[in-house]
Amino acid sequence: PAAIGKNGKIVKKCSACGATVTSSIAKISTVSLSAVNYTYNGGVKTPSVTVKDSKGRKLSNGRDYTVTYPRGRKNVGRYSVKIRFKGNYSGTKTLTYNINPKGTSMSNVTAAKKGFKAKWKKQSTQTTGYQLQYSTSSKFKKGTKTVNISKNKTTSKSVGKLYAKKKYYVRVRTYKTVKFGGKNIKLYSGWSKAKAVKIKK
C-alpha cells in the first residue's frame, strides 16, 4: 500500500492466463483540516478532513481512511484528530486544532503622569486572564511591551515609566491556560481594536 510520502503498488494475477499486472498507487501528499482555529461560542467544533495524493486526487473518507474526533470539542482547548489509512493506503496521521477564547474590547485609556490607565470589558467565560499590549507604533511593530494579567475578573491596569508627551497605542486580548500533551499551554483570542493615548509630563 501507499503511505504519506511513499508510493505503493498493486499486483494482480490473471486467473485465466496467469500473467501478473502491476499498477502504482500515488503517495499521500497532503492531509489537512478545514480550519485550525475557532473562537469559543459554546458549540461543538468539528473541522472536516481533506486528503490528497501526489497527483492531486482526493481520497475518500470511509474507503481510504477513517477519522476519529475527541469527545467534547466545545470548550477552549487544543484538540487532536486522528486519521487512519486503510485499503490501498497505510499509516496514521494526527492533526490538531484550537478553540480559542472569545476576545474583549478596550473601554478607555486615560493619560497619567508618565503613564496611563487602561480599562477593558470583562470576559470571564472560558478565560484565565488577559494580555495588555502597548506600543509607540500604531501597528505594534516597534517599542512594544506586553503585560500579563493573571485574573479574568481584573478589568484595569496602570502602566508607568513611559515617555512624556509621547503617543502610545494600547490593545488587549484574553487567554486561557489549558493542558495538552501533559503540558500547560496558553491559547489567545485576537487582539482588540487599539486606543491611542498621549502621555502627560
Residue ranges with predicted function:
Residues I28-R57:
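Solvent-exposed, low-complexity, repeat-rich "mucin-like" stalks and linkers
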Residues K153-K157:
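Short S/T/G- and acidic-enriched coil/turn segments that sit immediately N-terminal to beta-strands
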Residues K13, S80-R84, Y169-Y175:
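Extracellular recognition modules
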